Each structure stands twice: as C-alpha cells, then as structure tokens.
Design a protein with these regions (language model features):
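Conserved core of the PLP fold type I
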Residues: 160, 165, 170-304, 314-316, ...
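Active-site PLP attachment segment
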Residues: 111, 328-363, 378
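Short glycine-rich anion-binding loops that position phosphate/pyrophosphate groups of nucleotides
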Residues: 146, 278-282, 343
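Short, polar loop motifs at secondary-structure junctions
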Residues: 233-236, 461-465
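N-terminal basic, amphipathic alpha-helical segments
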Residues: 2-163, 167, 172-173, 183-185, ...
C-alpha cells in the first residue's frame, strides 16, 4: 500500500495509521519498529528493561505523550495486537492500558478502540524533561523516594505471577471505578488495626496516587471556586494541582504544634475544606498537637466544613509509636482520610486511597464514575495480597530500622562537614530532612547550585505561600546507603555552600 521504500513511508506515517495497520495484521516487526520510534523507546528491547513489562509499556507511551509525539485523538494498537507483536500476555498490556486510562492519558471507546485522550492532564500538555533510564539510581538526596534497593522485588514478582496464573476473564475487565474489592477490604482491615480508623470497604476509594485522590475529592466536593485552608509551608505539588482545579488556597501558618487553627479561623472561618498532614507535617515534620486536633475538628463540625487528612509519612516514626490518625478522633464524621503506598513501597505503583464518611459514599461514587480513574486491576490485586499476607507490615518494620540508620548517616555527615552553614531540624520521623541555613544566602540559590551539581535538594522557601517562612534545604536520606556515601554527599554540599557564601 506504500510506494517506494516502505520503511520511509512508515517512518513518515501518522501514528494512527501505523496502529491501524498493526491491528489489521498488515505489518509485522517493521510496524513495531515504527511504534518503537514513535514511542521514543530505548535501544534495548522490551524484555531487557529492568522495569516490569507493563510499567515499561506505560513509560514509553507516557514519554511519547509528554514529548508531543502522540497527541489527543491519536489511535493506539488494541491490547490483543500489541500483545501479539510483543509476544507477551494480554493481561500485561491490559495493565499498562488501564493505568494510562486511570490517569487520563488514554480513552477506551469499546469496539471503536483506544485513543490518546482528547483532554490530557496538565502534566502532559507540555514537554517534560526526559526521565533517566530505569536502571539509574534515584538522584542523590531526592525527596519522597523510598529505599528502592530494599524493596522485596522477588516477593512482589512472585505475587504478581500468582495473580496472573489465577486471572480469569473478569479480572481482565476494566474493574470497579472505586477500586478492586479485595484491596478495599485489605485497606479497611489494615487501617482499623494499625491506624485506629474504623471504616467499611464501601468507604474506601482507590485512586491513582495522592494526585488522583485530590482530583476525586475536588470533583466530589465541587471545590472549584471554593476556599481551602492550606498549610504554609505545605506540599508544593498538591498546591499546584489544587489551583489547577480552581481551588482558592488560604495559607495558614504552621508552628511547632502544626497548623495554627486560630489563624485559619481568623483568615477564613467559612472555608469549605482544610488540608492537613497531622502525623508528620510536610515539610517541617512537626505533629499536630492534641489541642490543635480538637480545635480543627470542632471548627469543621461547627462550620459544616471538611478536613482532608493526608496521612503523610505516618508509618515512619523513629521515636515512639506512630501517632493516631486524626480520623480515629473524628466523632462527627467530618474527616476524609487519604493514604498512599507510593512512598512505602515504590513510586511506580501510583496507588493511593481515600476513606470518605458514610454520608459521602454515594457522592464520591458518582464522581468516580464520571472521572473513570480506573487503576490497573493486576496491581491492585497484588497489593491486596501484599497486605493480607502480612508482607506490608513486615516491610514497614524493616524500613523503619533501615531509615533510622540512613537518617543517622546523613545527619552525622551534615553536622561534621556543614555545621557552619546548616542546622539540622530534629524530627521524630519521616523520610526527609530539613536543614536550616545559618548564613544569609537565599536557599533557592543554594538549591539551584546543588541541582546543577547533581544533588536533588529542595529550597524550603519554594514550599511557602507567604514570605517569611524561613530559609532551609530539604533533602531525602532513604537512598543514602552507607556512612561513606553520606560523607561524600556532605563534602559535595559543603563545596556548594562555600561557593554560594564565600
């Protein structure tokens, strides 16, 4: 059907044409090579990637979308066609497609096929920096990254294999928009036992990470144009998403006792929502005091407002037991509890959840149906097994011990080499450190210099909504595996600090 060199014709053909030919069986390996070109794949074949195959398929499609090589409305191969070309199980391709659908990048149109979504999430609307190869270690001092070297990959792979072997036709379907029932049951059981949160599986909604949880919440509570208390400083990426959803943020200061509820009331008593990280404030690491918890719940009950509890880093507490969830103290049912497995297991999981009050189950269910943020069933069922079989709690116990050790490595190195420039804040838990600047140099200048030198340091001031929040550096320690590595990082940071403040 092409004149001249077929490879040249395929190279210049629109992706939708190539996908259509592939679906009709009219092209073979050349067709897949063309698809690889469009997806900007690595030279190594799919089977050589260190990622699970479904994640590698997902990654390649995301990269092509982010770089603008696949656009809204472009057709993609059917699950069956792509599985045949790659010589892999249909369930593997289905898992990748479900993940892309749940995040809003694909639209499944039944017998009409699957296409790139007409309206892409904002993150995909402009080219993004190319991610490092999957074999690369996380950037030094990167925040929010669990210890990937300590994740039980063989165990996880075995659970995935077991799930695939017992997969039936129903399991390959799109699944419930609220999430796999087995995972919702497992989460409800875990929260009751370890976080003091009593709920039914019907109150649990599985989302695509914390961002997916916020998107569902904003839709269900109709937050566009509404005001929301937001911790200052607070999680910068959530702040961006909320603004994109049309939420008007009311900055509320954070001190040693957490969110200053009285300040929130003075600034906007009638705010519809408050978002808090009560167990381990992001990024300062303080816990919301009992007095402040009671005041926050009383305000929500009196005003008819809602509180979103982001249970951020609650499981990683190195001094004493994990603090009780705010939801466990919520007698008037005004708290929506949010959790995520990404920082406890691995970021690529993209698995978060919401526990909503019984009165909101129907409302959130309608929003879930409208948004169609379906997650990959295979991932959800594997995570359910991981929880139900006790692997999750054992993994957390191991990680607490490991993180306490690695935290000590980095603190010691910073105190040994950078004490003239930095003062490390004492924190009872979490997977990040905050080091306050002792010298009069803007933290964003230091952070930029550190980033250019390969250190993924964040400036504290970038996390604030109002000026005067202090100057400091935020850094992760979970992948600082040895004291020697910590010392090397401390010396590199010292050189940067000296250059910024000679």
């Amino acid at each position: 059907c092409f004149m001249g060199n077929p490879w040249v014709a395929l190279r210049d053909a629109p992706f939708s044409v190539v996908a259509g030919l592939l679906d009709r069986g009219m092209i073979g390996q050349v067709g897949w090579d063309m698809i690889r070109l469009h997806l900007v794949v690595l030279p190594s074949p799919l089977v050589m990637s260190s990622l699970p195959k479904y994640q590698e398929i997902y990654r390649r499609f995301r990269l092509a979308i982010d770089q603008g090589q696949l656009g809204p409305g472009d057709r993609v191969p059917s699950v069956r066609s792509l599985a045949l070309e790659l010589k892999i199980a249909r369930g593997t391709v289905e898992a990748a497609y479900q993940l892309l659908v749940s995040e809003g990048f694909f639209e499944a149109r039944g017998q009409a096929g699957t296409v790139i979504a007409r309206t892409l999430p904002q993150v995909a609307m402009k080219p993004q920096p190319v991610a490092p190869p999957p074999t690369s270690a996380p950037p030094a001092l990167q925040m929010g990254q669990p210890a990937l070297d300590a994740f039980p990959r063989k165990l996880w792979a075995r659970l995935v294999t077991q799930q695939v072997r017992r997969t039936d036709a129903d399991s390959l379907a799109m699944g419930d928009v609220r999430g796999a029932q087995a995972l919702r049951v497992a989460i409800a059981s875990y929260l009751a036992l370890y976080r003091g949160v009593e709920c039914t599986p019907q109150q649990v909604f599985i989302c695509s990470g914390y961002a997916g949880s916020l998107t569902l919440l904003c839709d269900a509570l109709q937050m566009a144009g509404q005001r929301c208390w937001y911790e200052d400083p607070g999680y910068v990426h959530a702040r961006q998403l909320l603004r994109h959803q049309g939420v008007e943020l009311v900055p509320v200061p954070v001190d040693r006792e957490g969110l200053d509820v009285e300040q929130g009331i003075q600034r906007d008593r009638q705010a519809r929502l408050a978002i808090v990280t009560p167990a381990h404030q992001s990024p300062l690491g303080v816990a919301l005091s009992l007095t402040r918890r009671q005041a926050l719940l009383a305000w929500a009950q009196k005003q008819g407002s809602w509180v979103l509890e982001d249970d951020y880093d609650s499981e990683f507490r190195y001094q004493g037991q994990p603090l009780a969830a705010l939801k466990s103290q919520d007698v008037h049912d005004r708290v929506i509890h949010a959790g995520s497995f990404s920082k406890m297991l691995f970021p690529g999981l993209r698995l978060g959840y919401l526990v909503v009050p019984a009165a909101l189950v129907e409302v959130f269910g309608r929003s879930a149906e409208a948004l169609q943020q379906r997650g990959a069933q295979l991932l959800q069922l594997t995570a359910a097994d991981f929880l139900e079989q006790g692997h999750f709690t054992r993994h957390l116990k191991k990680m607490r011990q490991l993180y306490a050790l690695r935290r000590g490595f980095l603190v010691a190195a910073l105190q040994a080499h950078c004490a003239d420039f930095l003062r490390v804040d004492e924190q009872a838990g979490g997977i990040n450190l905050l080091a306050r600047l002792r010298v009069p140099v803007p933290d964003q200048v230091v952070a930029m210099a550190a980033n250019e030198a390969g250190l993924a340091v964040n400036a504290l001031s970038a996390w604030t909504l109002e000026p005067g929040g202090g100057q400091g550096l935020l850094m992760g320690f979970t992948n600082v595996a040895t004291a020697e590595q910590a010392n090397e990082l401390g010396l590199r940071l010292l050189q940067i600090l000296r250059a910024c403040h000679p």
